[in-house]
Structures are given as C-alpha cells and as structure tokens.
C-alpha cells in the first residue's frame, strides 16, 4: 500500500470511487475554494503504471482505476469534462460535458501503455470506442490545410455552435497517440 500512501500525500488532485478529481479552474462553472471536477487525464494512473513491477500493488491499482475510467466513457466514446467553461461557452457555444482532446488523448496514451503491459486484449474495447469517436470527429469536424492536412479542433460538444480552434500541443499529442 506504499504506492497509495505516497499518492495520497502528493498534490491537490484526488482519486475517488468514480474517478480522478482535480481542483476546478477559475473559469469553470461551478468553481470555488472547494470545487473539484472529474478529469479524464488521470495522471495518478500513469504514475502507478510506471511503478510496475517494482511496486506489487501498482498493477492492481492501475487495472481498477482504468476500469473505473472505462465506466465514465460516454455514449459518444469520449470522457467528458462535466463542468462548463466560461470561455468555451462564450466563444464557441460549447457547454458542460464537452470533449477536450488533450485530456482524452492523455488518457488514451495511458490505456495504450497499460494494454501493452498487461496484454490479452485488456482495454481494447475502451480504446476502440474512443478511436471510433475520434475518427468520426476528425472526419466531420476537421479544418483542411492548403496541402491537404487536417487540423482537429481542440474541443467538441454535440450541441456546439462554432468549431473551436486547433492548438499545436493538442494536435501533436493526438498524432503521437495515433502513432502509438
């Protein structure tokens, strides 16, 4: 249980029974001193995964946490950021429950690494559901470049009014995840 004790004493993010919670940023709705939201990018799982096989409980914690996150995957195939964002709502009409490519791609990378370590098709269904969603969003929401490349918007919501921007850091992370 040393891995868990070390994690619990590290930082302001917390694992709860249904996912990884981070303090809500000032521009999220709701926000405040003691407001947290469930974040798709469950970085503590990455930490446990990296401690295998030196830490005997790391494998069990990784599997349980990834199973919990798989249950949070919505009907579209992504892990929603549940609170609203003032600027996404104001600039693009994107409300609560939006898709954030960065957080989802970070979680995808964790699933890919875990699937490679554990083998036996573990997490394939979750990975494939997400990749199906991502392929659909890329196909329907991309912005084409002059040379035929695709820029995938950083955020998405089923009721979005205006397609948002594409950031290099989000795009590069997506390309690396697809490569892996």
Q: Locations of the language-model features?
A:
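Flexible internal linker/loop segments at domain or repeat junctions
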Residues: 141-163
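Solvent-exposed loop and edge beta-strand segments that line ligand/cofactor-binding
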Residues: 20-49, 88-108, 155-172
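Hydrophobic alpha-helical segments and helix-packing faces
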Residues: 123, 127, 167-174
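Substrate-binding cleft of extracellular glycoside hydrolase catalytic domains
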Residues: 67-123
């Amino acid at each position: 249980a040393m891995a868990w004790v070390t994690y619990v004493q590290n930082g302001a993010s917390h694992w709860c029974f249904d996912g990884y919670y981070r303090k809500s940023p000032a521009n999220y709705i709701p926000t405040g001193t003691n407001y947290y939201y469930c974040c798709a990018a469950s970085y503590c799982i990455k930490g446990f995964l990296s401690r295998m096989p030196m830490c005997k409980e790391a494998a069990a914690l990784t599997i349980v946490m990834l199973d919990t996150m798989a249950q949070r995957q919505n009907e579209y195939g992504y892990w929603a950021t549940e609170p609203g964002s003032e600027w996404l709502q104001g600039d693009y009409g994107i409300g609560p429950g939006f898709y954030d490519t960065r957080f989802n791609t970070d979680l995808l990378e964790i699933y890919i690494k875990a699937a490679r370590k554990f083998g036996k098709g573990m997490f394939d269904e979750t990975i494939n559901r997400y990749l199906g969603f991502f392929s659909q969003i890329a196909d329907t929401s991309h912005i084409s470049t002059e040379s035929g490349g695709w820029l995938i918007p950083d955020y998405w919501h089923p009721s979005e009014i205006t397609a948002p921007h594409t950031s290099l850091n989000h795009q590069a992370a997506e390309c690396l995840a697809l490569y892996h």
